């Protein structure tokens, strides 16, 4: 009797395991690769939009700016990581450093339209060699895939565009003044200025993907964020 019960339980475990192994195949039977890709891209597009709205000023035409996005959140705020900052603060330039950090973040926030345009174009044409693996790759699989595939292009876009905002908000001139103060204090007149574009872009990109991962996870795990129940995003992600 005990042997029969044991064999019965063993068969149940085997069947259950087999069903779990077939889950990916089940989704593939329900949806084509093109449909899964479309659903992944809808999720990516929604996550990017939510990220841009959280971190950047996307459209201020006729609207009052209600927040300072990157700057408002300690989790995403862009800081000066250059070695001269500690020296400046120690010599009484805390207010000037704080002012520079503020306008530096504002410059990053003003890149919202450019960031939105970059990702809208990128996601529109995005393909995945094995879309089903991305679908079942975990709560941040889309973000990680885009990070791997498109981060270098994203960085290049920001490196090209951020200087425009730096000039508009006097980031460059303010930074130059603080560098000069540093040179006066230390006597270290470096022939080349300390760069500020690269560390700013690096922090922007890190913050962007960090926030996008959170938004993707929310979409994957919350049916209310998946749109119309008859839509492709909802139908595909409801199989997870």
Q: Which stretches of residues belong to each language-model region?
A:
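Non-transmembrane, aqueous-exposed alpha-helical and coiled segments at domain scale
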Residues: 21-38, 136, 210, 216, ...
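N-terminal Sec/ER secretory leader and immediately downstream segment
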Residues: 22-105
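Residue-level signature of catalytic and energy-coupling elements of molecular machines
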Residues: 51, 127, 223
């Amino acid at each position: 009797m005990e042997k029969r019960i044991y064999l019965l339980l063993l068969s149940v475990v085997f069947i259950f395991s087999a069903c779990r192994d077939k889950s990916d195949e089940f989704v593939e039977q329900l949806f084509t690769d093109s449909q899964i890709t479309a659903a992944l891209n809808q999720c990516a597009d929604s996550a990017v939009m939510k990220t841009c709205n959280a971190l950047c000023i996307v459209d201020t035409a006729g609207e009052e700016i209600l927040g300072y996005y990157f700057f408002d959140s300690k989790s995403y705020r862009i800081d000066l990581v250059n070695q001269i900052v500690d020296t400046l603060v120690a010599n009484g330039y805390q207010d000037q450093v704080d002012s520079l950090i503020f306008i530096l973040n504002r410059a990053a926030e003003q890149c919202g339209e450019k960031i939105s345009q970059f990702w809208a174009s990128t996601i529109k044409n995005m393909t995945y060699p094995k879309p089903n693996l991305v679908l079942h790759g975990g709560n941040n699989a889309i973000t990680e895939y885009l990070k791997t595939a498109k981060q270098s292009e994203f960085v290049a876009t920001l490196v090209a565009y951020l200087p425009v905002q730096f000039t508009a908000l006097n980031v460059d001139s303010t930074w130059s003044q603080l560098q000069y103060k540093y040179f006066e204090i230390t006597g270290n007149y470096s022939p080349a200025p300390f760069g500020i574009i690269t560390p700013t872009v690096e922090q922007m990109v890190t913050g962007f993907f960090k926030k996008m991962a959170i938004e993707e996870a929310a979409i994957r795990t919350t049916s209310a964020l998946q749109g119309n129940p008859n839509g492709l995003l909802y139908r595909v992600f409801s199989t997870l």
